[in-house]
């Protein structure tokens, strides 16, 4: 028999009156649809996973979310056996010129900074892109201003006529966020961006979420990458809340 004993936001987990660990439920104020779960179980036994997550879903009254490194095989097996689904893989990439396989490009790059008109356009473009590509994982629920507050102050971008078609928010050698209106124009932009940055920096770094086509296209321009990732698992069994 599985029982949970609550202390504030922490739950002690008992199986047949024996403590097998604890877990914590918490919120991310920027992504409020899902309830985040931090598991600290001594024995992630797949025999109790379905019962445990069904009970947590009742308590939270919304989908559950767990973040885990992709090399944590035992924990991942526990999540999958209980009904979680992997919704996102996030790859951390750090590369140099020797890793680049994208070839030459001649997209015309422009630069703007916070406070300029094109910077505001780039912010709105990125916000729409982020909201669309991440809504199936855990939608952004904070306001637009909060989103912009976390962005770097420098943008590299390209235009077709008067329209901005590709954007990269950058900070020194880090490409923090990218987006574009279509894959073809963004691919040309990304190659030019990378070649330009690698002329200035020995390495560049960025994160690529597999739910974000632009970030994954950027990742595809390089070889010799580490394939471990930081993964997002979601449990969204609404039937679990019925009694």
Regions of interest found by a model, annotated:
Residues 132-171:
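A mid-sequence, solvent-exposed acidic-amphipathic segment
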Residues 44-107, 190-243:
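Acyl-donor-binding surface of acyltransferase catalytic domains
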Residues 1-55, 159-190:
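Conserved donor-binding loop and adjoining core beta-sheet/short helix segment
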Residues 86, 110, 136-141, 201:
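A general structural signal for short secondary-structure boundary/capping elements
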Residues 125, 129, 147-150, 221:
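Residues that form generic nucleotide/phosphate-binding pockets
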Residues 9-11, 33-35, 89-93, 154-156, ...:
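Short beta-strand micro-motifs in enzyme catalytic cores
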Residues 1-16, 104-138, 242-243:
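Short amphipathic alpha-helix that is part of the acyltransferase structural core
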